[in-house]
Amino acid sequence: METETPMDVETKSTTSNTNDNNNNTTIVKTTSNIIKEGDHVILDINNGEKFSVIKVKLGSKVKIGKKQILINSIIGESYYSSFQVSNEKNTLERITQKEIDDRLNNLVELNQNDADNRNLDQNNTAQKLTQEDINEMKQKGTDSNTIIKTIVENSESFKTKTSFSQIKYLKKKIKKYSTIVKIIKPTLKSLTEAYYKKDSRKICGLRFDSFGQLLTLGNIRANSQVLVVETCMGLVTGSIAERMNGQGTILSAYIGKGPSLSIVNNFGFNTDVLNTIYPFNLNITSVLNKGEDISKLPPTASSGIYDKQVKEKEKEKEKDENVKDEKESGEEAKTIINQRNDTSNENIVKLLKDGGVWSLVIVTKYSPLNILLSCWPYLNSSGSFVIYSQFPQPLMEVHQFLHKNQMAVNQQISEIWMREHQVLPKRTHPMMGMDGASGFILYGTKVTKPIQKSTTTTTTTTTTTTNNSINPTKTTASLDIENKVIDATTSSSSSSTAAATTTEEDKEDSESALKKRKIDE
């Protein structure tokens, strides 16, 4: 086991790593990438077949398959190192990628001709060995290489396969009869892949590519104050903390009896980063919005957060009430941290009211509309909000509500989609077993309605002697009715008007004729 070196000293160790181009790579060891006791690491078992998140402790064992394996040998090694499970000692033995590739090549001579698979029969009669024979070799403690080589030699169809099919067959047998473990450093990408592979429902179906849009569209940056509501075991809170790196404030609201931020511990954050996270019950916002007394609420429970004395207490003794074991696919633990004084209800209210928040992130399995309205008063104007859901209908409800009430601009709903590809010589193709879609995102910017000033209009009315004058204060409907009445009256009295006009003309003619007679006389 190597001793820990100072931060400014690098210990270089060259490891031959044979890939498709037969190039050698150099692994540089520094104190930042060396596995130490107390670190959280991810065990990648058989190239993604299974993931397990553990805390490294001297003398502790991890369940891999049906065996309890001692993990002392990984302390002092660099991250992304590979280990092989020893069948005899139940320990992890260091193995390089070159040794893995050489073992694959030395098992059997691969077929280099232009063979194809047209004559293969899918009747399971090509293998001469029975399952009893293979189990007998296992019980005798036969090496995995010997077992695989024996299986290949007793296969009648192996020599007729193409070289690609032979490599695929050998990799499948190596994965079945031997166990290779790679130690991965916990990051947002690696933790998301591990929990997505384990049970995607616990993290609401989030993939690592979803966080690129969540953090960017939510305007997550350093020196900002963010309000997050999630039901993903702390994965979203941890991603925001990783982006902000201890600069800013994260208000993590939870729904229910207590917070669930167990994944935050697995990131391996230092105390400065963890002290920026403030968990609180979402009921606080509802009480504030109603104007009720906040002192009536029970004290806010805190978990997933380190206080200043947590690391010292962990080194001395781990209290039973602060540790909750979770047995899922092996031995894994969730650490619940002591309650902090600065996560009291009064302090949370002060953080919400003093300056508000500039980003609102909602990732939950519940309906997002009520949660959004509860948190909306504390999002500053021009602040960014982003909501994730596995289904588009809840986001449509939020979009329509905000648009109708003119509460947000630049709203858009987008679908998260990604397709992973295998890139190998003459074997490049999309991965057939992955999910294409990973939910939907609604994002936008909060706006405040402008104050509408009341305007007074003055109407001047002129009085005329016309009998059919229209009152300007009447409604449009009454004007239409009166116009129709006037038109009807005009059309019905057209004949009487013409007769009256003729009578007046006759009178004028008779009067003019009388005047002429008087003049002549």
Curated annotation (Swiss-Prot):
Q: Where is this region: Disordered?
A: 1-24, 305-336, 452-521
InterPro entries (UniProt xref)? TRM6 (IPR017423)
Q: Name one GO biological process term.
A: tRNA methylation
So where does this one cross the membrane?
Answer: none
**Record has Nucleus as a keyword:** yes
Q: Name one GO cellular component term.
A: tRNA (m1A) methyltransferase complex
Top-level taxon in the UniProt lineage: Eukaryota
What UniProt keywords are attached to this protein's entry?
Nucleus, tRNA processing
Pfam hit, one: Gcd10p
- Please give the name of this protein: tRNA (adenine(58)-N(1))-methyltransferase non-catalytic subunit trm6
Its quaternary structure? Heterotetramer; composed of two copies of trmt6 and two copies of trmt61a.
Q: Where is it localised?
A: Nucleus
Q: What does this protein do?
A: Substrate-binding subunit of tRNA (adenine-N(1)-)-methyltransferase, which catalyzes the formation of N(1)-methyladenine at position 58 (m1A58) in initiator methionyl-tRNA.
List all Basic and acidic residues biased stretches. 308-334, 510-521
Q: Which PANTHER family match?
A: TRANSLATION INITIATION FACTOR EIF3-RELATED (PTHR12945), TRNA (ADENINE(58)-N(1))-METHYLTRANSFERASE NON-CATALYTIC SUBUNIT TRM6 (PTHR12945:SF0)
Give the compositionally biased regions (Low complexity): 12-24, 452-476, 487-502
UniProt similarity note? Belongs to the TRM6/GCD10 family.
